[in-house]
Regions:
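Signal peptide-proximal N-terminal region
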Residues: 4-6, 25-47, 69, 141-143, ...
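Extracellular/periplasmic ligand-binding modules, especially the Venus flytrap/periplasmic-binding
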Residues: 164-166, 213, 218, 265-328
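Extracytoplasmic "Venus flytrap"
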Residues: 1-27, 50-57, 81-84, 154-162, ...
Length: 402
């Protein structure tokens, strides 16, 4: 075998496809860079990408192809898009000795009883919500609102449930009154007008969202049309920098706080970002500037480090790659907080830090290419940091128990 087959089961045609396509592009460029520099242990890496259309049964079909122990199989999966999708393969991944990096930040992945072979990237929806609500509360107090009220709104399932659970934990710890808890009520593609009406009626000072960029756009524009413009914030998938080019841009500028697990495109002083930009611009000069590349790049960094460790251990089997993940620390060249998975104590190893960014519409360059360079419209406020309430939380499994 002169190649190392690495799999990605990615949403290339479903609700997150615009972002995931860019994430896969970055992984592709990363592995091309690794291969140009001699590969891993003298072998070239072949990235095998299959589309799940953000559909769980399709994801399971794709996994069946990748778990094959013959020539069609892969040694690890460097991206599995979706929380319910990855949950559906989590137990099989243990049976198959396959390491999987999820494109999902469900807090259950850190629990060895559930996500033993799921090697998560960065923090999770729950802790991101705790950090985010703590910042939002502080921000409102700085604006002169001593006891700001909160509404929570999100999707059902592992993603929505986990993000909303973290917001509830933060509200409880900080004594924030939750005037509307609409976690689990927003259905993508459905008529969400009644939910928006409930948000407007509750009239909270701040709203925490665990949505998609499409449903956040509906909610913010729908509420604004009824004269309701609170301070909005939410989990990573709620926001896309591309929204700044649409009707919502001005309201995002004044009324939305962005949370991230990674740095964004224009964050100064990050050595790994300069490497990424140079490689991406050389490989795809006409592609648009995007924060999503950083997600794909860091996924590939973690996979690369594990494969290098497996090669060093002289065990490039699937089990050898799983073992390698449990031995390494990944520093991501400053693109994200340092990460480890081994050691046997998830409360010690779970990443609690996230980043807070301000939306600056003037810094958004719509359609700017990698060759030209440009901004994605966010400026770092704080991070990587964990709120005191997040540091104090004992990790004992997923915040959301569906």
């Amino acid at each position: 075998e002169d190649t190392i087959r690495v799999g990605a089961i990615a949403d290339l045609s479903g609700i997150f496809s615009s972002l995931v396509t860019q994430i896969v592009d970055a992984q592709t460029v990363y592995w091309d860079m690794v291969n140009a520099n001699g590969g891993i242990g003298g072998k070239q890496v072949e990235l095998v990408v299959l589309d799940n259309g953000y559909d769980v049964p399709t994801h399971l079909e794709r996994y069946e192809a990748m778990r094959d122990t013959g020539a069609d199989g892969v040694v690890m999966i460097s991206q599995s898009t979706g929380s319910p999708h990855t949950a559906a393969i989590a137990e099989m991944a243990i049976e198959d000795d396959l390491a999987v990096i999820p494109l999902s930040w469900f807090s259950g992945w850190s629990d060895p009883a559930f996500g033993k072979n799921i090697f998560e990237s960065y923090s999770n929806y729950c802790y991101e919500s705790m950090n985010g609500v703590e910042y939002l509360n502080r921000y409102m107090q700085d604006q002169g609102i001593a006891n700001p009220t909160l509404s929570i709104v999100g999707f059902p399932g592992e993603y929505g449930g986990d993000g909303s659970a973290g917001a509830r934990l933060a509200a409880e710890a900080l004594g924030i009154e939750v005037v509307a808890d609409l976690g689990g009520t927003v259905i993508p593609g459905a008529d969400n007008t009644p939910v928006i009406s409930q948000l407007v009626a509750a009239n909270a000072d701040m709203v925490w969202t665990t949505l998609s960029s499409g449903t956040l756009t509906e909610a913010m524009l729908g509420a604004s049309a009824q004269g309701y413009e609170p301070m909005w914030s939410g989990n990573v998938p709620s926001f896309s920098y591309l929204m700044l080019g649409g009707d919502l841009g001005p309201l995002l500028d004044t009324n939305y706080i962005v949370n991230t697990y990674i740095v964004t495109w224009n964050t100064p002083g990050v050595p790994g970002l300069e490497t990424l930009k140079a490689e991406m611009a050389a490989a795809m000069p006409d592609a648009v500037v995007s924060d999503s590349y950083i997600v794909g790049w860091t996924e590939a960094q973690a996979a690369h480090e594990a494969l290098e460790q497996a090669a060093k251990n002289r065990d490039m089997t699937r089990a050898g790659v799983v073992r390698a993940f449990n031995e390494i620390t990944v520093d991501y060249d400053g693109l994200a907080p340092r990460q480890t998975w081994g050691g046997g104590d998830p409360n010690a190893s779970v990443v609690r830090e996230t980043y807070t960014y301000d939306v600056v519409l003037a810094d958004y360059d719509a359609g700017a290419t990698l060759a030209e360079g440009g901004g994605t419209g966010t400026v770092l406020v704080e991070g990587p940091r964990a709120a005191d309430i997040t540091k104090a939380h004992t990790y004992a499994g997923a915040c959301y128990q569906g």
